[in-house]
Amino acid sequence: MENNLFKIHSDYKPTGDQPTAIDSIVKNIENGVKDQVLLGVTGSGKTFTIANVIERVQRPSLIIAPNKTLAAQLYSEYKKFFPENAVEYFVSYYDYYQPEAYIKTTDTYIEKDSSVNDEIDKLRNAATAALIHRRDVIIVASVSSIYGLGSPDTYRRMTIPIDKQTGISRKELMKRLIALRYDRNDVAFERGQFRIKGDVIDIYPSYMNNGYRLEYWGDDLEEISEINTLTGQKVKKNLERIVIYPATQYLTADDDKDRIIQEIKDDLKVEVKKFEDDKKLLEAQRLRQRTEYDLEMITEIGYCKGIENYSRYLAGKNPGDTPDTLFEYFPKDFLLFIDESHITVPQVRGMYNGDRARKESLVENGFRLKAALDNRPLRFEEFREKSNQTVFISATPGDFEVEVSDNHIAEQLIRPTGIVDPEIEIRPTKNQVDDLLDEIRKRAAKKERVLVTTLTKKIAEELTEYYIELGVKVKYMHSDIDTLERIEIIRALRKGEIDVIIGINLLREGLDIPEVSLVAIMEADKEGFLRSRRSLVQTIGRAARNVEGRVILYADIMTDSMKEAITETERRRKIQKEYNAYNHIDPKSIIKEIAEDLINLDYGIEEKKFENDKKVFRNKTDIEKEITKLEKKIKKLVEELDFEQAIILRDEMLKLKELLLEF
């Protein structure tokens, strides 16, 4: 295993309270502290701080972000900091994903439908390959990292080291490539394939941009080269040694195949008999037919569609055992950094239950063996058990993070640019729309941008239409806007094609925009999850990357949440201004280049939500029960800080209340 040192490449040195935060975190890691928090305000350089921590402690690191877009931003930043080291990207590789599901009430089976992004698949494979052969690895991941993967032991065991001196026969190489799930294709040469032309074998590894060429004389290996897969030209000649890693993490080793097939057959027999005993003959027939087809495929080629549902057998685990995940590919001393932990931790908490509910229906109706339930994300307690030493990163850490960190909290309130938290002004809600229009025009004249947050989608859309009629360059952004369109809207704002974004929850990805000098919060006194202390502090922070940053709260009363958010912001402003005065710092706005496509890695669209069949309400009682049910769900989502989903359910609940008036 290679053991290169982590080395930061940057023109900057830690400044402000970055050095103190770095020293504190490093000391806690070296002293074996399991959990700690980096409480860093927006624009304080938290990523640079963590990069310095990694360089100081020299340990492999996993950084988990709450979504693909933020993960892509972090990946780009860490790649620049560590060009000599293995910085990898591990997120869901689906451009589109409709999970397999069964709706019993309508007897509807929905087959898994997905589109895999080849580039992201390559990056995922590069991540696991890097962990096998080197220690200087940083992997930036989304919560996909807590989903089951194939066994790392099988993955390691099946890699193919090829040495020019000792060689490997053509027949043996082909056999092992097929076992590693490489397909032979002598016509179209794509990633995860190999081709044979006479005495030449070309391999296109699943984790590389280039490929390898092995030239034989009979069965004697004469030369190993790295090639351009498009032109076939040699990029590097006379390589002494290469290693071919698997094309996927889900593998069936030949010496395990008999065991795997027998275990599946045994479980199939038991589960079919149970259905037959319960007089569920359709389910019994369905399960037998589907599983026997999969068994035939595994027997012939070591693989079948949906093989992840048999991952428990592949890994040799017992029912209910914790699945192998990306965590198992790391050495035991790895570090875990959870970015935007106030969002990411609740996400991790909720993953298991959502996945379980969908799969139970498939198992109960004979579409899958019970083993499919073990192809799952980690439970939260399993996630915590697998996590080694953890640093939670957030401007507003959740109660859980603060509690488990036991006062090991490093505050980072000073920005390298000297920018202080924005001034907050409270204005009455009367005439708020026209008052805000004046403020928008002032900012637009100075080529500055504005973010506006409302309480509902309807208000966001109506306000946008009203301002467009008055000549304002504005767009709205809410949960109906898909990931790619969100990215384009943000990019348009940064480039000045629009001056204003109006949205509901402006805490989501990509909204740390230096050009924004005003954040307006409409109806700030409507106490609720979108106007909680934590939400307000986060939203206020959106104006903290511009030296002219201001926040207007439109409110007629002072809520507890407003008071707490304003008090916290004033505390930070005081510390920041004192630091600037003492060090003679003149604040400067953050300068951030506008990428051509903002994030060229984020081709992906978030997983499509699975919708139940529409309910039919026959009386007022049915509607009232559904409203009560939704209220409980909303409360739970708010506790988990899943505001986007809470908003969707809140809107559903409002429609039901309108429907109730019609009875």
From Swiss-Prot:
- UVR domain residues are 624-659
The alphabetized UniProt keywords are:
ATP-binding, Cytoplasm, DNA damage, DNA excision, DNA repair, Excision nuclease, Nucleotide-binding, SOS response
The segment(s) forming the Helicase C-terminal domain are: 432-594
* The family this protein is said to belong to: Belongs to the UvrB family.
Where is the protein situated, by its record's location annotation?
A: Cytoplasm
Q: What is its main location?
A: cytoplasm
Name listed for the protein in its UniProt record = UvrABC system protein B
Q: Which GO terms describe its molecular function?
A: ATP binding; ATP hydrolysis activity; DNA binding; excinuclease ABC activity
Per UniProt, the short sequence motif Beta-hairpin occupies residue numbers 93-116
Name the InterPro entries for this protein: Helicase/UvrB_N, Helicase_ATP-bd, Helicase_C-like, P-loop_NTPase, UVR_dom, UVR_dom_sf, UvrB, UvrB_inter
Top-level taxon of the source organism = Bacteria
Q: What does this protein do?
A: The UvrABC repair system catalyzes the recognition and processing of DNA lesions. A damage recognition complex composed of 2 UvrA and 2 UvrB subunits scans DNA for abnormalities. Upon binding of the UvrA(2)B(2) complex to a putative damaged site, the DNA wraps around one UvrB monomer. DNA wrap is dependent on ATP binding by UvrB and probably causes local melting of the DNA helix, facilitating insertion of UvrB beta-hairpin between the DNA strands. Then UvrB probes one DNA strand for the presence of a lesion.
Q: Which SMART domains match?
A: DEXDc, HELICc
Indicate yes or no for the key word Ribosomal protein: no
Q: What is known of its domains?
A: The beta-hairpin motif is involved in DNA binding.
List the SUPFAM superfamilies: C-terminal UvrC-binding domain of UvrB, P-loop containing nucleoside triphosphate hydrolases
Q: Which Pfam families match?
A: Helicase_C, ResIII, UVR, UvrB, UvrB_inter
